[in-house]
Every structure is written in structure tokens, then in C-alpha cells.
Amino acid sequence: MVQISQIGAVLAVCSTLTVAAPTKGKARFNVPQVAVPMKAVHHPAVAYARALHKFGMKVPKAVSDAARGSVPTTPTKDDEQYVTQVTVGQGKLNLDLDTGSGDLWVFSTETPKDQSQGHNLYMPTSKSKRLDGYSWEITYGDMSSAGGDVFLDTVSIGNVTASSQAVESAKKVSDQFAKDKATDGLMGLSFSVLNTVQPKPQTTFFDTVLKQLEKPLFTCTLKHGQPGSYDFGYIDDSKHSGEIAYTNVDNSQGWWGFTAESYSIGGGSNSTHSFHGAQHRGTRGSSIDGIADTGTTLMLLSDDVVQEYYGKVQGAKNDQQQGGWVFPCDAKLPDFTLSISGYNAVVPGKFMNYQAVGSVCFGGLQSVGSSGGVPNIFGDVFLKSQFVVWDTEGPRIGFAPQA
């Protein structure tokens, strides 16, 4: 997740971190996600509000009210959250891997006990180096927040270790984070310009270990309703079918930005649209710029596209009380297809059913708003439908169907 103050920031990134180099330039590793039982399920408007605020967009009052007025509910025994185990210092933590932020921050022994209870904690030791005068502070879209100081310590995933990685130790977290027992922090995988450490930003784990890797890339194979995986330094061809379609990345803001030329809803010869003037069937005009973000749960697109999609869903409505588009849980949902450099990336309709709220279900596709200049967000609802390559050479991003 990206904090509000990151919008438009292009920072000078510190390049002084040292890296352990076993078999330099040959490393590759797989990072499977693990399933962690969820202790509480928040109203989906919380995820929606966080996504909007994350990228500096205005949060409609109905969305804000639904998010702030919601309370966690007890999940069923089958509800799980998928995280990645990372060794930070001497201990293993469950972290979210987030391509939309540049910070590695964790719960620690510095976090007050009433906020850290139930979490795995990072424990600085005599081998950890505190960066005197350095700090970090993040506020997210649902007004959750965290902040603290910074250490240099070893961080390991698979067979790769950064021996002097910036680890942001939480000295305070808001209730939203304290109550989320499934995760112990976040590992950012954006470009390092988004790192928030002051007075000098630090490099991400990926950038720190980049020269160790066989190839300067990572891939993700996120799954719908089950754990996925990340691979660093190589492409596992057994995880995708067909050729990988690449498109250029715009990283001027630090994100993995790319362009989609058109979309279609359902099937049929009359279902293709450009993103400009979406109300006109078959027109071809301006393309759409968006951000690929594993740290955003939903897919957020312009009002006209979202309205057209739900116009094909019987009983769907933009519900002010629920803070977004909802529909009967047994409604038939059409597929949604994005055209990216000639490749058709299909999001199955069932992925658009994000979460039940009372007697209806909250949509995985929501509006990014109608004002110009706001980015479109291709979050997990989209990414779980694809095998994705995040390649720093270019830079570029690649898509293929999952095997």
C-alpha cells in the first residue's frame, strides 16, 4: 500500500546498502504464499476507501461512511488470508508483498504490547544497526497508520539474503493494523523512489538483491481462493500457458504503470470498446493508463466502464449505504477482458464477486471516479487472473494465462 504523501513524489534513493552475494548473479528462488486463518473480516468498503486514498483520489462520502461505520465480523472456518513468510533479523514474519509501495515495515519489540499482541515480532539485536535520526510514517486511505524508526539488518527470502536491508520498525500502529493478526507487516516491491524513510529514502529488498539474481525480474502467480506464489530471478514456464505478452512500464511515479488499449464485457462481436467514450459501442479512441498493484484488493476503473459492466448484471446497483456497487450473490457475472499490447487478459466473472455484505455481494470492480488525471488501478481482482512478469529491464511488464 502507498501512503497519501507519495503521490507524484520522485525521490533520490540511497544507494549505500550492502548486499550479501552468494553465487552473485545466479540466484533464483520461489516464495509460496501461506494461508493464515482470518480473525476478522472488515466491510469491503474499507478496502475500497484504502485503494482510493492510496493513490490520492477523493473518497466519496458514502464510501467513507461505510468504511468508518463498519466493524469486523467473525469469518467462517474457510476464510483465509494469503501472506508470505520472510526472515527478518532472527525471526520469521508473515508479510504482504506489495508492488504499490517501497517500504519494508514490520511489527517489532518496539511496538507497544497492546498493539502487537498476536503478531510475530521483529527483534533488533546487537547485530542490528539503528539509523540514528531516521524515521518513517505512513497513513493509509482508511486512516490506518504506522510509524517508527529504522534499522539495517539481514532479510532473507529463499536462498537470497540482503545483509544490510532497511527494516522499518513500528513504534506505533493504529487499531486497524493491530487487529489484523494475519500479517506482521509489509514488503514493498515498487521502484525504490517510493520509499518513505526520512531524511534519506532506502532501497527496496528487490532492488537491494537485484545483482544477486539470475535475471532482474520477479513473477507472481496469485490465485483466486487459494495461495499463490512469487518467483524471483527467473520465469517458471510451467506456471503459464502460451507466450508472455510484454508492454512497456511507465515508472516515472515509482509504480508499475502500463497501458491497456481497450476492454470488452462478456462475449460477442459487438462487445469491444475503447476506454475513451465507453458509452459508444465499438468506438476506438484513447487508451487507458493504469497501475499494476498487488497491494490493492480491488480493480478500480472509470465510472462509465464500471456502470456499463454492472448494467449487464441483474439487480446490481450503486448502494450508498454499502459504499459501492453491489448485486445479488447469485447473480450471473460476465467476464471482463482487457486488451494489452494485443493480448486479451480475461478476468472471469466469478472474480468480480469480492465479498458478501448482508444479503448482497460487493463487487470486485469499483469506480475510480470521473475526474481526469486519476490512475486506474489493476489490483488483485485482475492480477489473480494472470501470470505476471515484473521486469526491471525496459522496464516492462508481461502477462500470460495461468497454466
Swiss-Prot record:
Record propeptide residues = 21-67
- Keywords, sorted A to Z: Aspartyl protease, Disulfide bond, Glycoprotein, Hydrolase, Protease, Secreted, Signal, Virulence, Zymogen
Any coiled-coil ranges, and where?
Answer: none
Q: Which SUPFAM superfamilies match?
A: Acid proteases (SSF50630)
What GO biological process, any one, is recorded here?
proteolysis
Q: What is its main location?
A: secreted
What molecular function terms (GO) are annotated for this protein?
aspartic-type endopeptidase activity
What residue stretch is flagged as signal peptide?
A: 1-20
Write the Enzyme Commission number(s) for this entry: 3.4.23.18
Positions of the catalytic residues: 98, 293
InterPro entries, sorted: Aspartic_peptidase_A1, Aspartic_peptidase_AS, Aspergillopepsin-like_cat_dom, PEPTIDASE_A1, Peptidase_aspartic_dom_sf
Q: Which residues are glycosylated?
A: 159, 270
Q: Name one Pfam family in it.
A: Asp
Q: Which CDD domains match?
A: Aspergillopepsin_like (cd06097)
Catalyzes what?
Hydrolysis of proteins with broad specificity. Generally favors hydrophobic residues in P1 and P1', but also accepts Lys in P1, which leads to activation of trypsinogen. Does not clot milk
> Any keyword Protease?
yes
Its domain of life reads: Eukaryota
Query: Which cellular compartments is it found in?
Result: Secreted
User: Where do the Peptidase A1 domain residues begin and end?
Assistant: 82-400
Instruction: Reply yes or no: does the keyword DNA repair apply.
Output: no
Q: Which GO terms describe its cellular component?
A: extracellular region
PANTHER family, per the entry: ASPERGILLOPEPSIN-1-RELATED (PTHR47966:SF2), BETA-SITE APP-CLEAVING ENZYME, ISOFORM A-RELATED (PTHR47966)
Summarize the protein's role: Secreted aspartic endopeptidase that allows assimilation of proteinaceous substrates. Can catalyze hydrolysis of the major structural proteins of basement membrane, elastin, collagen, and laminin. Thought to play a significant role in virulence.
Protein name from the UniProt record: Aspartic protease PEP1
The major lineage groups are:
Eukaryota, Fungi, Dikarya, Ascomycota, Pezizomycotina
